[in-house]
């Protein structure tokens, strides 16, 4: 086992035993380890550490590898749990989930700068909010909600503001 390295493919042989402390009540007691393949070169990031001590640029350049790190994956699990709780609560209260367009010909509400783009050689913008569509759909379904990306083309003086984020919107 001491010769094992990250990204190796192995076959484990052993016996399955009941163990109440194990996550699913069982554990494999290994009697043999066979290395099936080794990586051609070491991974560019040490994914076995709790925290990736590297730059954002390196994390993005090696994103498929960085996401194998437990802390990097945890960010997605937290987002998923928040969105699921929001959805579950609103479903329980009789809301209908809608999915609004994210590309439009113009902005639906004022006040926010828009990301402009060319869409099949015509000017378009990314959605800054689902508000216009929610107000239209509430007349149909009475209670509506959406979880989805929104885009704001605004410069910020801090690193804590995002130009794209997941919006949790409801209307009744």
Describe the function of each predicted region.
Residues 1-172:
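Class II aminoacyl-tRNA synthetase catalytic cores and aaRS-like
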């Amino acid at each position: 086992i001491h010769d094992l390295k990250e990204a190796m493919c192995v076959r484990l042989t052993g016996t399955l035993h009941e163990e109440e402390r194990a996550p699913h009540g069982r554990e494999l007691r290994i009697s043999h380890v066979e290395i099936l393949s080794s990586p051609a070169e070491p991974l560019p990031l040490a994914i076995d550490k709790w925290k990736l001590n590297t730059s954002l640029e390196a994390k993005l350049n090696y994103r498929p590898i960085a996401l194998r790190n437990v802390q990097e994956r945890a960010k997605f699990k937290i987002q998923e749990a928040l969105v699921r709780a929001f959805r579950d609560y609103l479903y329980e209260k009789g809301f209908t989930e809608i999915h609004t367009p994210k590309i439009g010909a113009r902005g639906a509400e004022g006040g926010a700068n828009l990301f402009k783009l060319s869409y099949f050689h015509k000017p378009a913008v990314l959605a800054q909010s689902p508000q216009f569509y929610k107000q239209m759909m509430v007349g149909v379904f009475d209670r509506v909600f959406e979880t989805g990306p929104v885009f704001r083309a605004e410069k910020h003086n801090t690193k804590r503001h995002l130009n794209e984020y997941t919006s949790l919107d409801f209307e009744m």
